[in-house]
Amino acid sequence: MNKINAAITAVGAYLPEDVITNDDLEKMVDTNDEWIMTRVGIKERRILRDKNKGASYLAIRAAQDLFERHGIDPKSIDGLILATNSSDYHFPSTASIVAHEIGCGDIFSFDMQAACPTFIYALEVGANFIRSGRYSKILVIATEKMTAFTDYTDRATCPLFGDGAGCVLLEATEEEVGVMDAVLHSNGIGKDHLIMKAGGSACPATHETVDNRWHYVYQEGQVVFKHAVVDMCNSCVEIMERNNLSHDDITWVVPHQANLRIIDAVARRMGVPYEKVMVNIERYGNTSSATIPICLWEWEHKLKKGDVLVMTSFGAGFTWGAVYVKWAYDGSTVR
């Protein structure tokens, strides 16, 4: 039996129409455009303002975009893995809601949560379902309504986050394309540096936790920045060395869009020219697990079969990693 690979054969995304600019934030907190651009490189971010719509709404729209533009029948999907840090509810899973709404039938579906790298974790998990030989098509969606947990009285964190969703379809192939390798890591030493302090079983919601604003993202920015630069750079070097890749072999670097200075550091460490790096943080901010698939969607028309992509991310926990992908189709042919 020939080796089975898991190829990315389609991408989709959805971004809400409403925008929060740096000028808007200047009216809410003590900040300004120059301060935000200098520190993180974000000009604006998208927001899903409807309080009755959660991450599932964004995921549904992203999946529909993929189905419509690529001519995919939802009934052909064997399973759905949903990456999110902003699920609609603790239970049921957001994945089950999405699978039903997009018309996939009674397929298996589940949520994954590994902070901002959840998409690359889910990509490797989905690829292994394909490699098992039991499944032909796995839909991997990353969806985030991060603004629901953003404190718009905190000048340190409110400029960072935006809402959005992106997705990819993994399909079985015997060609030498697809998810070729992944390095995934975690270390709980970072727990207290990037956290939502309340709402889980360790600290259930009370009047006190609400009054203390513990249901919003808390971040110690300098600590997180230092670890992110080191760990994202190291994971990229690790996957390049494991696969004998030089910087000349890489067509595109797809970094998590958390901070422009982190992205710059990763590109320098890999020795890759900046024109090979996908960057859209200025327009969308940090959409957590969704940043990488949103990049793939935005750059799809430039991607060619055989292109070598290295994706890398870092997040709470700490969690981090990198994935090596050989692109499976010419994006210029897609609507």
Swiss-Prot record:
Entry-linked HAMAP family: FabH
GO MF terms, alphabetically ordered: 3-oxoacyl-[acyl-carrier-protein] synthase activity; beta-ketoacyl-acyl-carrier-protein synthase III activity
Database matches in SUPFAM superfamilies: Thiolase-like
Keyword set includes Repeat: no
Name of the featured protein: Beta-ketoacyl-[acyl-carrier-protein] synthase III
Organism classification: Bacteria, Pseudomonadati, Bacteroidota, Bacteroidia, Bacteroidales
Function: Catalyzes the condensation reaction of fatty acid synthesis by the addition to an acyl acceptor of two carbons from malonyl-ACP. Catalyzes the first condensation reaction which initiates fatty acid synthesis and may therefore play a role in governing the total rate of fatty acid production. Possesses both acetoacetyl-ACP synthase and acetyl transacylase activities. Its substrate specificity determines the biosynthesis of branched-chain and/or straight-chain of fatty acids.
UniProt GO BP: fatty acid biosynthetic process; secondary metabolite biosynthetic process
UniProt subunit comment: Homodimer.
Main localization of the protein described in the UniProt heading: cytoplasm
